[in-house]
Amino acid sequence: HTLLIHGLVQRPLVFSLANLLRYPMRTQVYFIECAGNSGALTRPDPAQDTVGGLHGLLSNSEWTGVPLSTLLDEAGVDPRGKWVLAEGVDAAGMSRSVPLEKCMDDALIALFQNGEAVRPEQGYPMRLLLPGYEGNINVKWLRRLKVTQGPIHTKDETSKYSELMPDGTARQFTLALGPKSVITHPSFGMKVPSPGFYEISGIAWS
């Protein structure tokens, strides 16, 4: 498996896992949340379910990897480059356009999750990590990063991860997820035994 960086760069580069393991790494803890998390609440007849059933499409892990900015600096980004196409090697060929500004900020090429190599189902040997962005854009089994002038409008950005607006147009690239919070106790299906004072608790994340 290799990672190719090409497009609007001065030096196209190819990295193996062994190559990347020699680079300085960064470790951080953060959430990955599915773009469809809590989506059941937007239906005309919202689903009646537990907190986990309604809001559970997220996870929190410690990720370790090479800052993407390090690799892009080594490749030498052309001044015309404003976006980066990230492509996975999965059967669906998942591909998403990422603003270059985000790639140069806090993006990681993640090699480890919770202190061990990223597992196959999580994108082994490497995946893209974009803190604060919707889950699908954190491309697994990453094989290619192409620096481009604008977004590519891949099938995953036109047929799936776009939002149909009331006027019939589609809104694209609403990539960042805002802060969210939910009440976890009492949860759906629970009943308080009698009138009185009860503690309400929950979690918040961003």
Task: Tell me what each language-model feature is.
Residues 1-206:
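Structured, non-membrane catalytic/scaffold regions adjacent to prosthetic-group chemistry
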